[in-house]
Amino acid sequence: MKKMNVVAFVTLIISFLLLSQVLAELSSSSNNETSSVSQTNDENQTAAFKRTYHHRPRINCGHACARRCSKTSRKKVCHRACGSCCAKCQCVPPGTSGNTASCPCYASIRTHGNKLKCP
């Protein structure tokens, strides 16, 4: 009697594992079908599957701000402002002043008093 209970239990476990495998395969195949349908459905929807992010490369803000603030009379203030702007924008315009067209993010940051923040 005990041997029959063990055999029944093992059979039950094996059938449960097989059933769960079949269900996993079915859900996997249905996901593939819906994703392939949605990929070919519309041009705009395919962009969701092919997202590419264009991040600016990380720059050495300390070096870039040292170059930018080299001719200022208030170096600590310039370095602090330039460093926070560089960390946010990942760019610093060339030269010691001006040239903000090369980095529009850097040129558009303003203080609470609506003054340009970045030197």
UniProtKB/Swiss-Prot annotation:
The keyword Transit peptide does not apply. Pfam families: GASA. One of its GO terms (biological process) is gibberellic acid mediated signaling pathway. Six disulfide bonds may be present. Its main location: secreted. Keywords: Disulfide bond, Gibberellin signaling pathway, Secreted, Signal. It is found in: Secreted. One of its GO terms (cellular component) is extracellular region. It comes from the Eukaryota. Residues 1-24 form the signal peptide. Gibberellin-regulated protein that may function in hormonal controlled steps of development such as seed germination, flowering and seed maturation. Belongs to the GASA family. This is Gibberellin-regulated protein 9. It comes from Arabidopsis thaliana.
